[in-house]
C-alpha cells in the first residue's frame, strides 16, 4: 500500500481545484516533496507550517513524553496557522501527530494518513477473506 498516494486520493475527493491543503508533518518530509509529487497535477495548493523548529519540537516532545499540553499546543498553533492561510483541509502526515490528532483547528477538516492506511489494509483483509 502507498500511504501517501491513498491519502492524496482521499484529499482530492474532499477538495476542489484551487483549494489550499495544509500538511502537518516533519520538515524532513516537506524537503522530500513527496506529497507535492502526488498533488502535482491536481490544481491544489499545498502549504506547510512556516516554523520548522516548532514542528520538530512537537515531534520530539511526543517521542519523549507522549501526549503533553506543550505538544498539543504546538500542533494546534501549526494547524491554526494553516487554517489562517486558507487550508480548510489538512493532512496529519506524521505518526507522532496521529497520537494527538484532536489538537487541530476545529474549523479545518482533517485527514490522518495513518487512518487512511489502516482503512485500506482493513478493507483489503476483508476482501481477501471473502464472503
How should each PLM-predicted stretch be described?
Residues 1-131:
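Non-catalytic structural scaffold of enzyme domains
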Amino acid at each position: 500500500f502507498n500511504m501517501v498516494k491513498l491519502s492524496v486520493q482521499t484529499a482530492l475527493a474532499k477538495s476542489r481545484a484551487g483549494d489550499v491543503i495544509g500538511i502537518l508533518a516533519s520538515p524532513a518530509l516537506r524537503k522530500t516533496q513527496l506529497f507535492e509529487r502526488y498533488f502535482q497535477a491536481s490544481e491544489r495548493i499545498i502549504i506547510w507550517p512556516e516554523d520548522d523548529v516548532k514542528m520538530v519540537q512537537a515531534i520530539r516532545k511526543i517521542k519523549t513524553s507522549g501526549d503533553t499540553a506543550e505538544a498539543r499546543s504546538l500542533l494546534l498553533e501549526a494547524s491554526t496557522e494553516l487554517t489562517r492561510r486558507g487550508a480548510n483541509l489538512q493532512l496529519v502526515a506524521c505518526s507522532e501527530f496521529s497520537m494527538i490528532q484532536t489538537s487541530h483547528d476545529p474549523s479545518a477538516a482533517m485527514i490522518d494518513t495513518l487512518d487512511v492506511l489502516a482503512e485500506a489494509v482493513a478493507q483489503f483483509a476483508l476482501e481477501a477473506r471473502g464472503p
